[in-house]
Amino acid sequence: MSDQAYGTEPGDPTRAQLIGGSGVQLSQDEVSAFVEQAFAGADLDEKRICLVIPDRTRTCPLPLILGAVHRALAGRAKEVTVLIALGTHQAMSEQALGEHLGYPPGDPEKTYPGWEVRNHESWLPETFTSLGSIGRERMAELTGGLMTDLEVDVKINRLVADADVAIVIGPVFPHEVVGFSGGNKYFFPGVSGPELIDVSHWVGALITSAEMIGTRGVTPVRALVNEAASMIPAARLALCLVVESGASTLHAAAFGTPEDAWAACAAISAETHVTYLDRSYRRVLSVMPTKYEDIWTAAKGFYKLEPIVADGGEVIIYAPHITEVSVMHPQITDIGYHSRDYFLGQWDDFKDVPWGDLAHSTHLRGQGSWDPEHGERNRVAVTLATGIPEEVVRSVNLGYLDPATVDIAAYAADPDTFVEPHAGEVLYRLRPDVGGTEGSTEVAGSAGAGEPDGREVPLGGGDG
């Protein structure tokens, strides 16, 4: 992909206030002091402020961060609203919100007096306001020519548009749609309308998640997100974070414009959240944390590890706690999981399906091909070891494994299997001198030999 910013502001990490770095472990006192000092120097007096923060699918020590922000804004801000950037995820319960933000469930006033905490409600059209549209010519420029005849209405949660200052607070990780998450992505798609969500995700899917994930700099989707964010009438700031996956440890924090703070943290995330291996594996077992409540969100266990799976290999998503494919996107069970080329080759049949659903489908199916004569051929097999019934799993074109038969220790002892005990945030890749994942690796071991679960892995790239 091009190194250009597609006509948008790329961000300059040297302009952001920064603490920490790759390999650094910041103390709570260091983090609190940095946050309070950064906010003290910002123009926030008598302002209506909207804090846009992640939901529980992102590792982030929010009680620590928000505590410091609350102290920094006390007696200064006119009003403060905390908006959970759910995107199209389901709403967080009062119990979950309390645990996530560090207050007694149902009583944010006790910990954050004067603040209001709100879920972003993507299912309610009245919560949105239109900021205008991105025209066809500009869309073509932003997407590198992938979208040449499409105008997009840019809608965002009214709480952001009506604020004087909108401040993003959240981590940066490798991301399958945009390259690296964070920054303006918390606005779009975090609290945006469906139009830009669908288009941005489909642009990413056209490029493919394998190509996009962990790509540094401004990708076409990042350019689209930055363009939409520039239309927000509120002043925009961001406190971007680099967090140790699955822990509360902070490696770095940056404050400034969303573009500058994101650029600073994306560079550090690339050194922190991308692990390079010396060899490919025939099988990966992704053990999913309980914060992923359905396959829609747990799909991260696939695409964060797909690059290290040999051609014809398998990714097993192990999540006994998951009982649904998607809570908020039931239509995914109608179309199933397929590669990009499956949809493009039959576009007339799928063009009216929400493009965000199509994009998600490709994310969990990975690389593959399709033609009328041979049908679909996928690079790797995808198997669910979850609480979802076998008939449902197979109906969406995925393989099934009874989670009760999964012996994590046995898999870990198998030299042909890579076990990730906390899947979903760290991206795994092969070292450049080893090669990529498109036909450059060979299957380690022989099909069906020494399977920890007694199965024969569906090698050769079938339909799963």
Give a label for each model feature.
Residues R58-V80, A298-V309, I316:
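Histidine-anchored nucleotide/phosphate-binding helix
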Residues S2-S32:
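N-terminal amphipathic/basic leader segments beginning at the initiator methionine
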Residues Y292-T383:
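C-terminal catalytic subdomain
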Residues K78-T88, E314-P320, T383-A385:
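Short internal beta-strands
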